[in-house]
């Protein structure tokens, strides 16, 4: 959530507020992939600083980098890939066709986790949650907010309080609109 909020703040301070982009320009950023690496736990109500910047994109990809600091020490970093969609036509907007010149820009942060991987076919998954997308879960696009997906996954880890999650890779394949059903599947850990 802190990463997303930092992106929203950067938009407001350096270009256009997200609600203005959505309501006046009829455009929406939709996340397609998120890779987060965590080095130290960040407890609730911790004072942290989050830096975010735009990474030069290609095609319809608008990547964004993040670094989170607690007490001056790097505790997490991430790369997220976003698409910009025309909400009237539903068409993707190429990065060359949308001016990001007023945004802070830099290269992608280096992550030590793979950004892409294949899930082994032999894994056996079982459904552990099935529910409907509720009002408290949605964003301005009327779809489940991207931060809710990670929370739902975490909620379905047995004895989660015993573990420190060091990374997460999310690939968003479909949007989950208000009222739609979503399911969480889990497999046993493998070496």
Regions found by a protein language model. Give the residues of each.
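Terminal targeting signals and extreme-terminal segments of soluble enzymes
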Residues: 1-51, 55-191
